[in-house]
């Protein structure tokens, strides 16, 4: 349908250019706004004419009528639809037969590649997301970050880009030493294996324990952790050995959560391996005169050209800042995998940080610094409010997943399906993943959100499990058709998309036809919620079609055949769109 819409856009632009006359610059198709009418009875596409009416000295309604007359005389366009003047708009009723045939042919020819576009063909795009600390497990904020980063990576790859997913592991600094300090003092040699606690949670428990210790003995705690940090900086072998052990524990558990939620990376970077490069670059910038040094030997950058004040890049004792390691990491990445664009998926509390980071890298003379982009997103909380790792009030990602899994199991048991389903445990896990990812991705990334586990698991309405239910229902229908064919033999009926003219069929065909444009729009806006919104629209269109248009009990074989083809097309697009937003497709539920 997008091709037909563009065809009409260019046809309208061509006629507008004729009306303007040769003395005026021709109208380009891209200048024409194309909208979807609010009601089906008003057509399929609409062109507002307010802007162009002034150029030809007519009212918008007069211009719409004249355009309609001229386009009706264009026999080459008559096969693709009918123009109609609607006040200040030129509306077009597309040729249903043409759109249905074109859309279904494209879906069956391309299969699960349908929707793939060339928008980013040839581009190399690196995506950074997750960025965990090795002193605690992943929490709900990481779940939103991971979902956005992984989904966005899949979407831009589907638009033709070569995508490289990276993760910076924050494995050094005061916060890491806090867990190490508490472990040294209070663990008495315990390990995750001894306690049966998941390894990242085991490390996180010591981070909480340190903060309890610091509340009781603040001076001693401050001294202990600073001493540990200095010994780490000096490469004390005993401190480094403990650091490696606890980091390995934390990272092992974090990787298990990644695997559980379908998150993967092409390369991991570690702050402990990049911060020294950042320090070297800051000192080089000082030597080049782009930074300046204070009397205490700390190094700063002037941000007045950004409308800001100044920013410290290196402390007076030569120790690094948070921004220092990001400078080094960015340089290593550009060397490792030269990119056309690097997207940082990081929460909006870091907006200032990335504005400064990109500016600093430009000052250092790196041309690729112009290609850095911060994909900022809002905070996510649970209904009981904000969470704090140091107080132990954070709800781990695994806790949320376990809770969703248990609730999905209960729902399966409630429906009496646990015995009928061969892999009920696996299905419950996939339902939990669908509930989580759809809920996190249905909100525009820029907005703050509250994650409601119970709402996310609903099998009715705008949820991941509902989409899975729809997919399973379609699969069940097609399986039954296949069984009938095997028993009775195939029907000698030609499937003709031209028969799909019922209003519910037409709305479903148009929904399928819009998918490629939705993928491109999601990539352009770095916004997976475009796809989740599309899936909700598709599910509503299918439900209406399923209710209004009989399939198995349709007495006319040719109509039944055409509708079955439409159902098959829906399954293909549904599966593809669900994959882009990390929702497992289920054949049965």
From Swiss-Prot:
It catalyses: tRNA(Arg) + L-arginine + ATP = L-arginyl-tRNA(Arg) + AMP + diphosphate. This is Arginine--tRNA ligase. It is found in: Cytoplasm. It comes from Treponema pallidum (strain Nichols). Keywords: Aminoacyl-tRNA synthetase, ATP-binding, Cytoplasm, Ligase, Nucleotide-binding, Protein biosynthesis. It is an enzyme of class 6 (ligase). InterPro entries: aa-tRNA-synth_I_CS, Arg-tRNA-ligase, Arg-tRNA-synth_N, Arg-tRNA-synth_N_sf, ArgRS_core, DALR_anticod-bd, Rossmann-like_a/b/a_fold, tRNAsynth_Ia_anticodon-bd. GO terms for molecular function: arginine-tRNA ligase activity; ATP binding. HAMAP family: Arg_tRNA_synth. A motif ('HIGH' region) lies at residues 132-142. One of its GO terms (cellular component) is cytoplasm. Gene3D superfamilies: Arginyl tRNA synthetase N-terminal domain, HUPs, Isoleucyl-tRNA Synthetase, Domain 1. One of its GO terms (biological process) is arginyl-tRNA aminoacylation. Its main location: cytoplasm. Its EC number is 6.1.1.19. Pfam families: Arg_tRNA_synt_N, DALR_1, tRNA-synt_1d.
